Each structure stands twice: as C-alpha cells, then as structure tokens.
Design a protein with these regions (language model features):
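Amphipathic alpha-helical dimerization/coiled-coil segments
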Residues: 77-123
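Short acidic, hydrophobic short linear motifs in intrinsically disordered regions
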Residues: 22-31
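Glycine-centered, phosphate/nucleic-acid-interacting loop/turn motifs that mediate DNA/RNA or nucleotide
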Residues: 53
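Short beta-strand "wing" residues that participate in macromolecule-binding interfaces
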Residues: 57
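Short alpha-helical segments that sit at the start of domains
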Residues: 1-14, 123
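Short, cationic-aromatic polyanion-contact patches
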Residues: 3-9, 60-79
Length: 125
C-alpha cells in the first residue's frame, strides 16, 4: 500500500471533503472558519491535493467543486501504520494497549472494540 500523508492544512481540507462528500473552495473555507484561511490558501491546498491525486474537480457554474479520490479509511490506515512504526516501535499490541488504557473512553465504545476484536479473531485461522 502506498503511504498517504497529509500536512495539517491539507488534512483539514480533506476532512471537510470527506465529511461533506464534495465542496467548493468557499465551502471549504467556511467550514474551516476557525482557521481564518484566505481563499487563495484554500485554493492552493486543493490544487496541491489535486496534483498529488487525492482530489479531483468538476466545473460548477463559475467555480469548481472538489471531490476526494482517496477514502478517509485508507488515509487512516496509512496514518495508523506511521504511528505504530514511529511511536510504538512497530508494535500494534503497544498501540492497542495505549488506546484501551484511555480512562476517558466510554464503556460502550470499549464494548464495541471488544466485539470488533472478537470478530477479527474469528476470521483468523
């Protein structure tokens, strides 16, 4: 699998596209209002993402509508692999232990994680 990496600004833009399915430059800018980005900064990020092959655009009136071409789950898998390798010395077990030791996780979420782990164990020969 090819590694996918997004610098912070590109990740913020991609998050808007994943959440909304598509967006114009203005819509991305509005969604990121807390960052107070200039229109040209958002446009530049989208153009860079398009050059990298992570988004595509279609004309919409006088503007362009941008669409993600990579799924959030695929980007997440790549990010988790980087974290596992760089922070947890390649150990998924250490990473998992860190996640489940979080005292702020609600019991319901821990139960869902347990079911996911049980299901995965049943798939493994």
């Amino acid at each position: 699998m090819t590694e996918i990496y997004f610098p912070p600004r590109e990740l913020a833009v991609m998050s808007v596209l994943w959440r909304n399915g598509s967006a114009t430059v203005s819509e991305v800018r509005d969604a990121l209002e807390e960052e107070q980005l200039a229109y040209t900064s958002v446009l530049s990020a989208l153009q860079t993402l398009e050059e990298k092959g992570y988004v595509r655009h279609e004309p919409e009136g006088r503007a362009y509508r941008y669409f993600p071409t990579v799924e959030a789950a695929r980007a997440g898998t790549s990010a988790l692999a980087r974290i596992r390798d760089s922070i947890f010395q390649g150990s998924a077990e250490r990473m998992f232990a860190q996640i489940v030791s979080d005292k702020h996780l609600p019991r319901e979420e821990l139960e869902r994680m347990r079911r996911l782990l049980t299901d995965r164990l049943e798939e493994t020969p």
